[in-house]
A protein has these predicted regions:
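Bacterial N-terminal signal peptides
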Residues: 8-13
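C-terminal segment of classical bacterial N-terminal signal peptides
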Residues: 14-19
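Long, amphipathic alpha-helical surface segments
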Residues: 22-49, 59-95, 113-163
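Residue-level detector of conserved, well-ordered beta-strand and adjacent loop positions
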Residues: 56
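Long, amphipathic, charge-rich alpha-helical segments that form helical bundles/coiled-coils
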Residues: 100-111
Length: 163
C-alpha cells in the first residue's frame, strides 16, 4: 500500500511539474517592447523610498512631478511609469526603426544625453550596425567597471538586437 501511495505522489508531482513547465513562455515570444520592460524590471527592481530621487523601476523624479520623498510606489504605479518613460524614449529614437527599443533601454538607464553622444548612436546614424562592443561598453558606474551593468547590456543586446 505504501508503494502504491508513493507511486501516486511521484506521478502527481511529475504531472504538476510538466504542466508548470509547459505554462512558461519564452521571452522571445513577447513583442520587443514587453521584452524591454521585463529586462528593465529584472535589473532595476522596485526602488524603495531611501533611493530618492529614483522611484519605481529607476525613474528619476523631475521638478514638477507629483512624486514625494519617502513614498513607495505600488508595483502597478511603477509599471505604468516605466512603460510611459520607455514609450517616450522609443519615440525619441523612432527614426532608428528596429534599433529604437535598444536605444530606448540604454536611454532609460543612462539618460538620453549619454545616448545622444554615444558611439552606438553615431554608428547607427551612418548605417553601421556592428554596435556590440560600443553598446556593452556602457557598463561603468562612477568610472568603474560594473559586472551587473555588463550583464544587463549583454541581456539587452541578446534579446532586443535584431539582425
Amino acid at each position: 500500500m505504501k508503494k502504491l501511495l508513493f507511486f501516486f505522489v511521484a506521478l502527481l508531482s511529475l504531472v504538476a511539474a510538466t504542466a508548470a513547465a509547459n505554462a512558461k513562455r519564452s521571452i522571445m515570444e513577447l513583442p520587443p517592447f514587453e521584452r524591454a520592460v521585463l529586462i528593465i524590471k529584472k535589473f532595476e527592481t522596485l526602488h524603495k523610498p531611501k533611493h530618492w530621487p529614483y522611484v519605481g523601476y529607476g525613474h528619476q523624479v523631475q521638478p514638477g512631478e507629483p512624486y514625494r520623498r519617502g513614498v513607495q510606489l505600488t508595483e502597478r504605479q511603477a509599471d505604468a511609469l516605466l512603460r510611459k518613460d520607455l514609450r517616450k524614449f522609443c519615440a525619441l529614437y523612432s527614426q532608428y526603426g528596429k534599433d529604437s527599443i535598444l536605444l530606448a533601454c540604454l536611454a532609460y538607464n543612462c539618460g538620453p544625453g549619454v545616448v545622444n553622444k554615444s558611439s552606438v548612436l553615431k554608428k547607427l546614424k551612418v548605417g553601421n550596425r556592428d554596435i556590440f562592443k560600443a553598446y556593452t561598453a556602457h557598463c561603468r558606474y562612477k568610472g568603474k567597471f560594473h559586472k551587473q551593468l555588463y550583464q544587463r547590456r549583454l541581456t539587452e543586446f541578446a534579446v532586443l538586437f535584431s539582425i
